[in-house]
Amino acid sequence: MKKSNNKNNHKNNHNNNQGGENIRVRSPRRGEIPGVVEQILGHGKLKVRCNDKQIRLCRIPGKMKKRIWIREGDVVLVKPWDFQSDEKADVIWRYTRTEANYLERRGFLKI
């Protein structure tokens, strides 16, 4: 296997979405609702305004706490609990600005 001499090879492989390239976005599946973070409450909890006009108390699962930082105004994907589904949910995905714009254009995000 031939090794490349170009030390900056990783820079050549970046996906630049400004050129009209296709992007892959995780779309909401059954039982998942997109929403916007309204307030960070601490201890891994957030208030999220969901697409169905409900404000839910959402928690960030342990596997996401240190890997993904969530701020107010971020677009997230939440999965309501089986019980208290109108009040509580888990955050399962955070979208980037580009992905959020794509969701809004496609009609998934109606906030």
From Swiss-Prot:
Q: List GO molecular-function terms, semicolon-separated.
A: RNA binding; translation initiation factor activity
Family statement: Belongs to the eIF-1A family.
Write the record's keywords in alphabetical order, separated by commas. Initiation factor, Protein biosynthesis
Give the protein's recorded name: Translation initiation factor 1A
Residues forming the S1-like domain are 23-96
Q: Where is this region: Disordered?
A: 1-30
Which Gene3D superfamilies does the UniProt record give? Nucleic acid-binding proteins (2.40.50.140)
Q: Does the keyword Nucleus apply?
A: no
Which InterPro entries does this UniProt record tie to the protein? NA-bd_OB-fold, RNA-binding_domain_S1_IF1, TIF_eIF-1A
Instruction: Report whether ATP-binding shows up as a keyword of the record.
Output: no
Q: What does this protein do?
A: Seems to be required for maximal rate of protein biosynthesis. Enhances ribosome dissociation into subunits and stabilizes the binding of the initiator Met-tRNA(I) to 40 S ribosomal subunits.
Q: What gene is behind this protein?
A: eif1a
Give one Pfam hit by family name. eIF-1a
Q: Where is the composition biased (Basic residues)?
A: 1-13
